Amino acid sequence: MAITDFDRPEATSQLTTSGLVLRWMQSLVTSLLLLALGAGCSQAPAVATQPAANGSNAPAENGAQTATSSVSVPRDQITQISVINALMLGHYDGITTFEELLRYGDFGVGTLNQLDGELIILDGQGYQVHGDGTIDRVAPSAKTPFAVVTPFDRAEQQKLPQIESLEWLDDHLDEAIGHPNKFIAVRIHANFATITLRSVKVQSPPYRPLGVVAKEQSVWTRENVTGTLIGIRCPKWVQGLNVPGYHWHFLADDLSLGGHVLKCAAGSALAEYDVCQEWLVRLVDAPGFDTVNLNQDLNRELRRVESARDDEESEAPPNK
């Protein structure tokens, strides 16, 4: 009987060795593929999602101005653009686009390029309240010189028997929430018996200090209006960097009214709030920022700007 190569002992040994080598090479290739896939997954952009109406973190619909980005932001982080003393001293040129700002949160307050009105960010949408009271959606390319945002979770709630005044609201929330050395984001939806708001008109270079510009603000009072208070509370130790205490903006449900809140009163309401444990400050990369004296104590002037109200109110803003 003829003997084939496979029947020879030396051939069997060679075949066994070849099989081991082949298996080793297959294992090596598989390992390399797994490593490559793992690296690809780790480098894929993270997507910050907007909470859906049912409370899940489903991605927002296509085309919506929402907080989607490649930046991973802690849910309890406050992010601010520039510092308040720079804005007080007239640094009004926008440095961050609204699209980029939304990477850091879907809730907040601020202003727009050249101090063009009040900025309100609610549910990932941006609203610009102009100096004449009209309200526009903020374009992704619009820039801000100062803003404060956070991803809003509505983690905690506090029932309010009434809102007697803005001062009452501040004091009541401080007592109920506590955490005096941390940042708080607050959202309150209610029907307001009365509310007084302000906005400022767009400025042109050379810019005047905010304390001067605020004297020319437009002020409106409206009764029986339903809408949302958007508030950021900063601890007192941020003086010079942000606004110590509460910074309130308001937006009516029908978008007919909005602005920086000076006074308000309402019946019972529910305050939803987040306690923020992290704080990120993005400094200005703009001409003049490194030479301006930010060490000045502008707190008294800031308090006047935040609460100032002209005796003569402007004509009520037009309804949309």
Feature-to-residue mapping (PLM):
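Long, positively charged binding patches that form subdomain-scale interaction surfaces
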Residues: E167-I232, Q239-L241
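N-terminal low-complexity or amphipathic/hydrophobic leaders
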Residues: V83-A147
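Short, low-complexity, disordered segments immediately C-terminal to signal peptides
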Residues: P45-N62
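Histidine-centered divalent-metal-coordination microenvironment in nucleic-acid enzymes
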Residues: V243-L251
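C-terminal motif of bacterial Sec signal peptides marking the signal peptidase cleavage site
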Residues: A39-G40
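N-terminal secretory signal peptides that target proteins for export/translocation
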Residues: M1-R23
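A hydrophobic, small-residue-rich beta->alpha segment in the mid-to-C-terminal subdomain
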Residues: A252-N295
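A glycine-rich, hydrophobic loop/mini-helix early in the fold
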Residues: V129-A176
